[in-house]
Amino acid sequence: MKRKPAVAGYFYPERKDELYSLLSSFAIPEQHVSGTIIGAVVPHAGIIYSGRTAMYSYRAIEKSAVRDFVIIGPNHRPLTPYASLYPEGEWSTPLGDALINDRMAEALYRDSNYIVKDEESHLMEHSVEVQIPFLQYLFGDGFRFVPVILGDQEIDVARDIGEAIMKIEDPFIFIASSDFTHYEDAKRVEKKDMDLISAILTLDLDKFYSVLEKENVTACGYGAIAALMYYTKKRGGRMIFLNHSNSGDVTGDYSEVVGYASLVSVIP
């Protein structure tokens, strides 16, 4: 099955030349990190707003030889309370078609207690789709991916998915798709986001969920981030913070913004 783009013309340009030009405009220098990259946290808002921050992670990933990606984001319109996997086929964007790694998808489905095969939930969801043009920009059609969106983002689900991902045998990079605090003034957004980023860097899931609750951090993909934290800790790795920004940096209006962050996960 070929999935058509749901948010082309809304979250990113629907014309190939305009999309490529937008991605090219993010003049982010090469990101040198110590260690082997196994994961990243990236935003998924309109690319004009969050793309520059996202590109920090992708510029770090660019140096890796790995070309398989497990991309997990939130389901903003959950039809099921589960983790929904799109198990096979292709996804189209204005830059071309991206192929799902169906063997890796099947392994993830087999080893998780929460993941279900559910193409329908993906049809209008943008949290995974917005990542595909970045990968196409960097790697053309030379990559494959596994898309998962979470209707339930609680800690038990994050641990389960982290465990299932641990069992994948082939090399891959885990991309956790999430925006951070939504629709508050820029100073409050920066404070909340940096507190959550500090918790992410500890790889302590209990602390992470505590900060989310106590500070009311409205990071929409927190379950994906938590799964990446769990996986990173199990692999003996660490998280590295690369960049933070907010939508006001583009609009000029800092009274009500959305926060974005890029981090990468590395092992020695």
Swiss-Prot record:
<dbReference type="InterPro" id="IPR002737">
    <property type="entry name" value="MEMO1_fam"/>
</dbReference>
<comment type="similarity">
    <text>Belongs to the MEMO1 family.</text>
</comment>
<dbReference type="Pfam" id="PF01875">
    <property type="entry name" value="Memo"/>
</dbReference>
<protein>
    <recommendedName>
        <fullName>MEMO1 family protein Ta0237</fullName>
    </recommendedName>
</protein>
